UniProtKB/Swiss-Prot annotation:
GN (gene name): speA2
Known cofactor(s): Mg(2+); pyridoxal 5'-phosphate
Similarity section: Belongs to the Orn/Lys/Arg decarboxylase class-II family. SpeA subfamily.
Functional note: Catalyzes the biosynthesis of agmatine from arginine.
HAMAP family assigned: SpeA
Binding-site residues, substrate: 311-321
Designated name of the protein: Biosynthetic arginine decarboxylase 2
Pfam families for the chain: Arg_decarb_HB, Arg_decarbox_C, Orn_Arg_deC_N
EC number, UniProt record: 4.1.1.19
Entries under CDD domains matching the protein: PLPDE_III_ADC
Molecular functions per Gene Ontology: arginine decarboxylase activity; metal ion binding
Amino acid sequence: MGEEPVPADKALGKKFKKKNASWSIEESEALYRVEAWGAPYFAINAAGNITVSPNGDRGGSLDLLELVEALRQRKLGLPLLIRFSDILADRLERLNSCFAKAIARYNYPNTYQAVYPVKCNQQRHLVEALVRFGQTSQCGLEAGSKPELMIALATLPPPLDRQDKHTKPLIICNGYKDQDYLETALLAKRLGHRPIIIIEQLRELEWVLHISQQLNIKPMLGVRARLSCQSLKSSEISSGNGDRAKLGLTMPDIVTVIHRLEENNCLDCLKMLHFHLGTQVSDIALIKEAMREASQLYVELVKLGAKMRYLNVGGGLAVDYDGSKTNYPASKNYNMQNYANDIVAAIQDACELGQVSPPILVSESGRAIMAHQSVLVFDVLGSNQTGFSEPHPPDENAHPLLKNLWECYETITAEQYQEQYHDALQLKTEASSLFNFGYLSLTERGQAEQIHWACCRKIFEITRQLEYIPEDFQALDKIMTDIYYVNLSVFQSAPESWSLDQLFPILPIHHLNEKPSQRVILADLTCDSDGKIDRFIDLWDVKSYLEVHPLENDGNPYYLGMFLVGAYQEIMGNLHNLFGDINVVHIATTPQGYQIESVVRGDTMTEVLGYVQYDSDDLLEGLRRHTELALSNGQITLEESRRLLEDYEQSLRRYTYLS
């Protein structure tokens, strides 16, 4: 659905506090590292709000707070995923531009074609937008399953009118294949498509040869190689390569493919060499080494008589989630131009040395294309502050342990905080033991723990002022963090965070001209202990807390944003505790501001319950029977039963998240 353009300066809700004289947006920039991971798309404006520049360096920005409040006025509840179509277009354009520059730099006598791996994010609006943006650059699609092949065939327009058969958009057919998959891929050639079937198991070759003869369609084939270079064996991506890789052919397997194609007079069908390092390769050295091996393999295949045309380097182009520009798993020690340069240079050198024609270059850089375009915005529902309440001194007749703890609390100073800290720990342990053996009441134990946490907070405030924090006290950073309860499900909206320890930039989208005085972890709506985020980006390490602002009792929401979540998160999300898909909105920039391209409403309770085979009418009827029985037994009044049934029926139509 489209809407009228909204001027960027007319959006609702400019509820800004005055700038804190002791804090600046430059300090927020340094703390949250927005420029390091977000440039050129995300920044902080003078009002202390996050801005989004969907066109990157070409200018024009939107105030994210104003956008969120305008969307909420349209009855779009949080959590809310905002997709910026122009960022998607810009990422694809940048990738093509980097390879064009590399090709010009090295005088490479061939071209580059991007291919989007549908598995990265299969959402229809995104795939259709990418195909539209990629028409001029012949961007193709990669399918790793039969359903993804269905998407590719129906979404990518058949290039019937294009003369150069080698620059048509490609459909790369990866993954496990049965005979139906292969038949569909082969028949797609009749539509004018250019499907390349990647042989990843030897049995697939026999099926392709048999089906292609039956259909009288000459196949276009590729082989996926298991690279075995030394650095891959010790790296985090080794599971996708080497002798024990899940998919791909060993060197003996590839030789067998060559011989079988020769025997069937089909060696000219082999067109592509493909390898895949992973979706997030942080170290450029791994890419360099893999390219050396793959380039030499390409040359050898040509020398064996294969009519090779493409080198598909797969995925691996990483996203710098923490902005550190290192080989840490959440970062990368290279940029997109370095990546393109190294790929072009490696195959150029190998082909010149081997005296073979250089191939068309192909990459499946899904994460790098998709990650930046989506921003997840959610609100904070409440907090739990550790050791925040002021303790009361124990009575004269109180247990001696309580008196000792209170003395410890009162005598904490910057000069002797270490001794008091260890005393407080010991007394807390003693309190637990005394309670377990019945020598301390529940009330007394509660008071003991309250004083203990007050001691810890007092000591924590002292250690925060130190240039060097002794090792014994470094754990206080984690122990003394508060909990902010947030309106989302980590399992649904950030599954890589809990399953793979993936880091995403998270920060307030407003109040960034004020000092964030609270250190917190985030707890989601689920009743699972894993439903939390307690790892946050930092320059040198992973932080165990996020700096945020105190919650105000002024009725205004406090918004947090999770950035770079456009790749994999939506499709990997699950229905833990039956929290369903969230509201999604697609935003495009206009000369006047922005326009809502489409809205995808999140799951209602009826829809989520249907996923687990519950019918809402049956549920409502079941509750009605229970209320009628309760009415007849005098357990509930008629008015109460009416209200219960009305609330139940209305709830079934509502969003699964809190309003």
